[in-house]
Every structure is written in structure tokens, then in C-alpha cells.
Amino acid sequence: SFGLLMLTLLAFSFFSCSDKVDESNIYVFNGKSIADYIKEDPDLSYYYFMLQHAKSGKKGSTMDHLLEARGNYTVFVPTNNAVQHYLDSIFSTPNYDINQTPDSVAQDIVFNSIIDSEHNEAYKTTSFQEGTIDYKTMADRFATVTFGTNDTTGKVRIFIDAFSEITSADNEAENGWMHVVNRVVMPYSSTLPDLIAGQDNLLIFSHLLFTTNWKDSLQAIRDE
């Protein structure tokens, strides 16, 4: 009948339209996201803790959810030792309890470690050039790349913001590239005491700076 024919045509039209659904924004991966790789690696668990306590600014969501989503992210992930070293330095406390980390510090660590290339490719190390990376970090700063050479092996060494050496490069995920670093990434504009705190051979000096007023004096000199 005419009515049955119309129902058939409407049904066909509905399913035809359903086939045209844009899947570009559906958060489904065939492989793993950057967040998955970080979560599964015990040596990156401190950074994952930071992700869970850093707000993405989207309705209170945290950064671990951002790195589960589609995108083109370059992430410089510090090891547990790197995170512990940084916390010990800025709080002048050996073996600082990571659970006591203020959310603001977690956000600072995380935002300085992530570059969102939006619709462009995330960065492999083969695309790095000496100098400033084109896209800003989520902390709204330009990270820098410098190259060095291992004196023993002759292998190229890559440093982010001068002090954070990439120790495991080009770990590919569905939503970008992950590079493991041996220091928390902090920009050049960090205070001089904070930069000193990042160096193993200056730990005693760093402790003295943070336990005396010399830290403030150095900051005042830098600000002038």
C-alpha cells in the first residue's frame, strides 16, 4: 500500500542519514591514548597523579581526561624520580609527600609539559629544531629545544628548556607523542633559585637558598 511504501522510504532515509554521522569527535581509539600509556607505567605514576589534580578548565574536568581524548598532543612526561626531585627542591623537604602537593603546583607541572598542536601533527623528535618550538605549552609559554652529544657514545641528546633531557623518545599514541624526560619541564622564566633546584650538583646550595633569605635576594636581583 501507499502507506507501507512511505514508511519504507522514511526508514531508508533515516538509516542513510545515520551512515553519514561525523565520527571525528567520537572519543574512540583503536589503540591507546597518551593517558593510557602513562597510567600503565609504574615509573610515571607521580605524573599521572599530577594529571588527576590539574584542572583542564572545562567544567572542572582534570587533565588526565584531556589526554584520553582525541587531539594532537606532545607530552614531556617526567619520571617519578624527576617529580620527586622537583617537589623536594621547591618545598625544601626530602621525600616530600606527593599527596600533599597543592593543585596549583600540579597544574604548573602539567601545563608546562603539554603542547596542544590542535589540528596539526604533534611533535616527534625528528621534527625538532634547535630553538623555540612553534606551538606554546598549555602554560602559554614557548618551550625550547637544545641538542647535545653523549661524550661516550656520540649519541645525540635532546633537552627541553635546557635541563629536561629526553630519555625515552617518540612513544606513539592515538592522540599524539609522548617523550619521557628526566627533569620536570620548567621554562627559562622560572626564578633563578628554581632553576638551581633542578640541578643534582647544586642540591646543597639549593637547600641553603630555600632555607635562608638568599632565595628572595636572588629573585630581587633577577627582577631588576
Where are these regions (language model features)?
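Sec-dependent bacterial lipoprotein signal peptides
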Residues: S1-C17
